[in-house]
Amino acid sequence: MIRQERSTSYQELSEELDQVVENSELADEQDKETVKVQGPGVLPGLDSESASSSIRFSKACLKNVFPVLLIFIYLLLMAVAVFLVYQTITDFREKLKHPVMSVSYKEVDRYDAPGIALYPGQAQLLSCKHHYEVIPPLTSPGQPGDMNCTTQRINYTDPFSNQTVKSALIVQGPREVKKRELVFLQFRLNKSSEDFSAIDYLLFSSFQEFLQSPNRVGFMQACESAYSSWKFSGGFRTWVKMSLVKTKEEDGREAVEFRQETSVVNYIDQRPAAEKSAQLFFVVFEWKDPFIQKVQDIITANPWNTIALLCGAFLALFKAAEFAKLSIKWMIKIRKRYLKRRGQATSHIS
């Protein structure tokens, strides 16, 4: 198609050029005939000669100025095409170096039950129960209560210090986010030699993976190395609202991260004075919302769009160069014709 368009454009331009040349030759023949009719001894008048020369001069100027303007326009188009190619390549490289972070949300009806790893130390677990929406009032705080949670105990070596053995209580977390399921735990610490009392905990994505893991010690060491740990203090009810964030790494792996919002409420201790020496811990775990946040880096540079744009720019450059070359040839040919006619007219007048 491109070759056909070029051939047709060249044919049209050559036909116009031949027509211009034929018109100029016809004009010259008519001038010669008028001179012959007037006779060899009679010269044309000065007024008619000056008028015809001025008309020819104006036509020659127009014929010379038009190709120059056309070449200037083609050069301007070539400069714009070169700048467009450079800018396209630069933008493509910048987009490859700096991908854009994309955040999307996926709604779920229920979550996989997360694992809650608690490190109570000397504290004793008094009760653990699943509730929905609300927590009933405490009947006997500080005393053992219902234990309807799935729990596992495991001892493993601290991955950051090989000389420390840690004892973890693994509790199955809530699942039914639409029903606002929550897990309420109560601990009691009788005596402590420390100035401040707190229990550490960490969250990992799936309690079922922990149960099915053939190496639970290695699983917990990997979780402690990958996830952050938090604390909740005694004498308060700490409400933890969890949210799940999945991040896609560059190598294609998917990393899971827990984000949480905590609210702390003071516990009004109404126990007898003899029992107040024991510190009580209350903690609630609940899902914040049914949306999983997915984060990944997206490269916005589209190679096909860039290739198409570059092809169009190079095609424009090629067409501009071809038209400029043809215009220069046409201008040179017209100039030669004009000089030839001028020489013939001068020799004829002389």
UniProtKB/Swiss-Prot annotation:
Catalytic activities: chloride(in) = chloride(out)
Keywords assigned by UniProt, alphabetized: Cell membrane, Chloride, Chloride channel, Glycoprotein, Ion channel, Ion transport, Membrane, Phosphoprotein, Transmembrane, Transmembrane helix, Transport
The keyword Glycoprotein is assigned to this record: yes
Chain positions carrying an annotated carbohydrate: N155, N162
PANTHER family per UniProt: PROTON-ACTIVATED CHLORIDE CHANNEL, TRANSMEMBRANE PROTEIN 206
Record protein name field: Proton-activated chloride channel
One cellular component term from this protein's GO annotations in UniProt: chloride channel complex
Sites of Phosphoserine modification: S9, S14, S24
Superkingdom classification of source: Eukaryota
Function text: Chloride channel gated by pH that facilitates the entry of chloride ions into cells upon exposure to extracellular acidic pH. Involved in acidosis-induced cell death by mediating chloride influx and subsequent cell swelling.
Membrane topology: Multi-pass membrane protein
InterPro entries in UniProt: TMEM206
Main location: membrane
Segments on the Extracellular face: 86-301
Spans within the Cytoplasmic topological domain: 1-64, 319-350
This protein's encoding gene: PACC1
Localization, UniProt: Cell membrane
Gene Ontology BP terms: chloride transport
Residue positions, PTM Phosphotyrosine: Y10
GO MF terms held by the record: pH-gated chloride channel activity
Transmembrane regions: 65-85, 302-318
Record family assignment: Belongs to the proton-activated chloride channel family.
